[in-house]
A protein has these predicted regions:
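Outer membrane beta-barrel
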Residues: 105-139, 143-289, 294-301, 305-312, ...
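Gram-negative bacterial Sec-dependent N-terminal signal peptides
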Residues: 2-22
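Short, surface-exposed charged micro-motifs
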Residues: 27-29, 159, 359
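Outer-membrane beta-barrel pore domains
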Residues: 131, 144-145, 182-184, 194-201, ...
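Ordered, small/hydrophobic-rich secondary-structure cores
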Residues: 11, 15, 28-33, 407-409
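Short solvent-exposed loop/turn micro-motifs enriched in small/polar/acidic residues
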Residues: 22-23, 189, 353, 435
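Flexible glycine-rich, low-complexity coil/linker segments exposed to the extracellular/periplasmic environment
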Residues: 60-61, 252, 259-261, 271-275, ...
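N-terminal periplasmic/intermembrane-space "pro-region" immediately following the signal or transit peptide
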Residues: 22-137, 199, 485
């Protein structure tokens, strides 16, 4: 009930008990728990404000108007005399009208912590080797591939997010299923995202994102694992930004039309990447998420993409990304080909680390096609020279998919091919990765809270985790259950 209406009702009620009413000030209080209105203060009650009587049109009654110095007119013949009628005389100064600040509606009146929301998802994954040397396979994107590593919790995420005010929003995401490098136990809590978006206009088209967040290189890198169709990201793009994140500051421009399309591509189940602007530019440390910075230089990144929408409702997104900086790899003693050595790091301030990537996504309505390709230079182990040096790299992927809605949910069959030739800079000694892989699978979404993926993968990839970095071939059957909350 609005304050003015509330005051009107209270004054109207009092008028029934008295033939004439003076426009007196009235202070009202509301109980925090019961929401009842009181005329006296007490613990647990908040003051609504000070009110005066108004008529049904919201105006002060004549009795509340200030007195005038003019003498009253003589009564008409037969009219009642002043002695017969009690007329309220106002004070010399007019009574104040309601004084509290304008009432706030919706979220405007809430505390910032009341506007935060909590959501998340959990992925439970199972891998089973069915051919080749599957037991010797290793992949940066799935630690449950290999000997005695078949079933586990791949991700367990909680996201705390919301608007602190009109110009600042918060995003905080830990992962409770992490395994730090070198650890023999799993399911540690580790930070993934901790950033603030600072908006410069009311439409929220211009913003700066500051903190640890995804850096805008690679469309699939920006796509949430909760929305991604395939089980793992392509190594060609992910090897440039493993964990997809770093600490930095990035400016994004998202015009209203594009912002709405980015949101629709996620909410409609078309596997969008989210809103990272149609243009982005920024700087970041360059050593990766949750890793100490090892030089005084920053990486620079630029990003451009646009989601086109045809007259028939079909979406097509095209764009490109690039980054440049200097990366400091880690070296350790190895034995390769009967020779034991520790690769020399000839550029302690960091090796040239530059990449350019392009993407095109024809969203599954119902047929879809997704492709990315990257080229560049980065640190890589040179076994012959026993040192790490800057070398060229290239790779990418092509993925086809189909979206079918039916009585029991949604089916999304897919086929993905990927390849990569280049250094794996985040692994010790930055060994050269050789990768050729084909994966076929299907995702079934029986309800919003549940997703099930069944896939077959034929892999040929370098084990970049352990020297002498052999190339292993094998076949896998893979299963993942995802719970959204």
């Amino acid at each position: 009930m609005k304050r003015r209406n509330l005051a009107t009702v209270l004054c109207a009620l009092s008028a029934t008990a008295s033939g004439s009413t003076l426009a007196a000030e009235l202070e009202l209080y509301v109980d925090r728990k019961t929401k009842q209105i009181f005329a006296e203060p007490a613990p647990g009650r908040d003051k609504l404000g000070t009110f005066v009587q108004v008529d049904e049109n919201g105006k002060l009654p004549a009795s509340a108007m200030p007195a005038t110095p003019a003498q009253p007119l003589p009564p008409a013949p037969g009219a009642a005399t002043p002695a017969d009628t009690a007329v309220a005389q106002a004070a010399a100064a007019p009574a104040p009208v309601a004084t509290p600040a304008p009432a706030k509606s919706g979220d405007a009146g809430k505390k910032w912590y009341d506007k935060l929301s909590l959501r998340g998802y959990t992925q439970i994954r199972y891998n089973q080797g069915i051919g080749g040397d599957a037991q010797d396979l290793r992949a940066p994107g799935d630690r449950f591939i290999g000997n005695d590593q078949s079933l586990g919790i791949r991700r367990a995420r909680l996201v705390l997010s919301g608007d602190l005010n009109e110009h600042v929003s918060l995003y905080f995401q830990p992962d409770f299923a992490s395994t730090p490098t070198g650890s023999t136990t799993s399911n540690f809590a580790q930070l993934r995202d901790a950033y603030a978006d600072i908006f410069f206009d009311k439409k929220r088209e211009y913003r700066v994102r500051v903190g640890q967040s995804k850096m805008p290189y690679g469309w699939e890198n920006l796509q949430s694992s909760q929305n991604r169709l395939t089980l793992d990201r392509a190594d060609a793009l992910n090897s440039g930004l493993r964990d997809e994140r770093d600490i930095g500051a990035v400016f994004y421009y998202s015009p209203t039309v594009a912002k709405g399309r980015f949101q629709d591509l996620v909410k409609s189940g078309l596997k969008g990447s989210g809103d990272y602007g149609v243009i982005g530019a920024g700087v970041y440390n360059g050593q990766g998420a949750n890793r100490a910075e090892r030089n005084d230089s920053m990486h620079a990144v630029v990003h451009a993409t646009y989601p086109f929408k045809f007259a028939n409702g079909q979406y097509l997104e095209v764009g490109a990304d690039a980054y440049s900086g200097r990366f400091v790899p880690t070296a350790a003693a190895v034995n390769i080909g009967g020779r034991s050595f520790t690769p020399a790091i000839t550029e302690p301030s960091g090796y040239t680390d530059q990449r350019v990537a392009a993407h095109i996504i024809y969203y599954p309505q119902p047929f879809g096609l997704q492709a990315e390709w990257t080229v560049g230079r980065g640190p890589e182990l040179d076994v012959a020279q026993r040192r790490i040096r800057t070398r060229s790299l290239s790779g990418g992927y092509v993925q086809a998919m189909f979206k079918h809605d039916f009585n029991y949910g949604t089916l999304l069959p897919y086929l993905k091919w990927q390849t990569y030739r280049g250094g794996s800079k985040f692994d010790t000694n930055a060994p050269r990765m050789r990768l050729d892989e084909v994966e076929a699978g299907v995702e079934w979404q029986p309800m919003d809270a549940l997703e099930l993926v069944f896939a077959y993968s034929k892999m040929k990839r370098t084990d970049v985790s352990t020297a002498p970095y052999p190339v292993v071939e094998g076949d896998l059957l893979r299963l993942q259950l995802q719970v959204n909350y």
